[in-house]
């Protein structure tokens, strides 16, 4: 469009020169001058419009460039945030794996404790049975042996010694036998010899 207007302006200028050279009428000259003025006004308007278009284009380019910068910054922030989330996820997965391992160990310990508890309960039942059955029976036998033999045993002496006091006769008789020096048969016969045969 601008090229066409310049071409028209050149044509008008040529016509003006022709009129001036050919001594044409003043009306034709005025017409040509009016046409030239109109062309100049049109050129000025076109220049103003072109300048405004250039300014608008530069403003649009500036906005697009700023938007690109903002988009890149947002992208970098998002990428950084994504990496942070990924690291946190990895750490939590590792922590979760560690917790699962700890839970398995604790479950194993719990099972072992349950087994131990059952064993302790069995031992407690056996101990209760001993308390209610074996111990009274042993006490009864000990009293029976004491009543029959009339011997008070010394349970605090050396294990290799058999010590006590026999109260079966008129006089209390101490007993002290070294089991390392005498056979079991001898010791048994000796103790039986202390018992009274009078019933």
Swiss-Prot record:
The keyword Coiled coil applies. GO terms for molecular function: microtubule binding. Keywords: Cell cycle, Cell division, Centromere, Chromosome, Coiled coil, Kinetochore, Mitosis, Nucleus. GO terms for biological process: cell division; chromosome segregation. It is found in: Nucleus; Chromosome, Centromere, Kinetochore. The keyword Protease does not apply. Residues 45-134 form a coiled coil. Disulfide bonds: none annotated. Its main location: nucleus. InterPro entries: Ndc80_Spc24 (IPR013252). GO terms for cellular component: Ndc80 complex; nucleus. Acts as a component of the essential kinetochore-associated NDC80 complex, which is required for chromosome segregation and spindle checkpoint activity. Required for kinetochore integrity and the organization of stable microtubule binding sites in the outer plate of the kinetochore. The NDC80 complex synergistically enhances the affinity of the SKA1 complex for microtubules and may allow the NDC80 complex to track depolymerizing microtubules. Belongs to the SPC24 family. Component of the NDC80 complex, which is composed of ndc80, cdca1, spbc24 and spbc25. The NDC80 complex interacts with mis12 and zwint. This is Kinetochore protein Spc24. The lineage of its organism: Eukaryota, Metazoa, Chordata, Craniata, Vertebrata. The gene is spc24.
């Amino acid at each position: 469009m601008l090229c066409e207007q310049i071409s028209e302006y050149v044509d008008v200028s040529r016509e003006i020169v022709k009129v001036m050279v050919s001594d044409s009428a003043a009306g034709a000259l005025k017409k040509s001058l009016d046409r030239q003025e109109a062309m100049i006004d049109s050129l000025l308007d076109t220049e103003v419009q072109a300048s405004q278009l250039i300014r608008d284009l530069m403003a649009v380019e500036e906005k697009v460039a700023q938007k690109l910068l903002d988009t890149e910054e947002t992208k970098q922030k998002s990428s950084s945030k994504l990496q942070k989330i990924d690291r946190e996820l990895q750490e939590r997965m590792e922590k979760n794996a560690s917790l699962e391992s700890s839970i398995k160990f604790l479950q194993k310990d719990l099972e072992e404790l349950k087994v131990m508890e059952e064993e302790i309960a069995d031992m407690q039942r056996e101990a209760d049975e001993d308390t209610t059955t074996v111990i009274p029976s042993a006490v009864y036998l000990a009293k029976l042996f004491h009543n029959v033999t009339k011997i008070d045993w010394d349970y605090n002496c050396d294990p290799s010694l058999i010590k006590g006091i026999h109260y079966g006769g008129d006089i209390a008789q101490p007993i002290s036998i070294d089991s390392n020096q005498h056979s079991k048969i001898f010791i048994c016969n000796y103790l039986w010899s202390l018992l009274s045969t009078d019933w």
